[in-house]
């Protein structure tokens, strides 16, 4: 039994020890990650870790390889960023310490990835060799290798490039095979991957998206007009073709850059999407996928991104009109602002509740932050050749 006279000193000592044990180390600030994000700096193979509350760069992480078409996903706790390099490198970056905790060279050429619903697995889409590899999200140890095989017209077994890889509810992954014209659905609930193939979906699927509720997977087709839709609530129904006129059409217009399907916007019962090769944003009915309207815009749109409250849509454009961002009011369908953030605008990202929009201008070496209410610039960050911008709220959103 502790004597009464010793209780207060011992309690004070215990409290001091507890506080000391909880203090942040000099290299790791004790803080949350909900307002953090990263900017890909493609020329230097680095990430800029940013604070969206203070609108500043906190740290830079180097040694990430070829980031010319890099994408980023986040761990379930939003502390770690998984960086998918074009050179096949997969890196796990600690946003708080600014360190690479793990890195593997898992293929010769990769094009993105996804994190499973339970956060335990990281999947990587590979061009070379074509397929999907799965890794433990804490150690980056390989868990499974799923070759993207198909039979060509001569009956020979080939491997296809994998595109449009996303996570789906039920601890599943969905992706498309470019050369094969297939969609594959992988269930990871058992000891081994369970693969379902959907064939003859259309020619050369080049990108895909999954809706915010995880029900519909939509693949864009490079080799023909139209889109391929898979209802993940009823996969047994197979793939449905929608928007048959979506594409380059009979008049094969020059396309400076194929629009990203991730840049589509689902706002209420409407889908807002970039036209291919035309200076238009298209509006489709999200129930029957009929085309409702065409809005003329500044150039060939790449990303058509909604503010989280769905009141605004922000649009950037392909070369040579890629120094402009236009803002559209979704109610009036009018362009309410034409912004000039800098040369070669590549990406846009909203803060979680939409009060800010961050825009990367690669050839101007800067990221510009806008107030989405006033549409005024509120900050400018120096960044060498910035491209993709990714905020940690993506950790808790399907397909992002």
Positions of predicted regions on the chain:
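Predominantly soluble domains enriched in secretory-pathway, periplasmic, or organellar proteins
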Residues: 22-400
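Bacterial N-terminal signal peptides
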Residues: 11-20
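Bacterial N-terminal signal peptides that target proteins for export
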Residues: 2-11
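N-terminal non-cleavable signal-anchor helices
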Residues: 4, 20-21
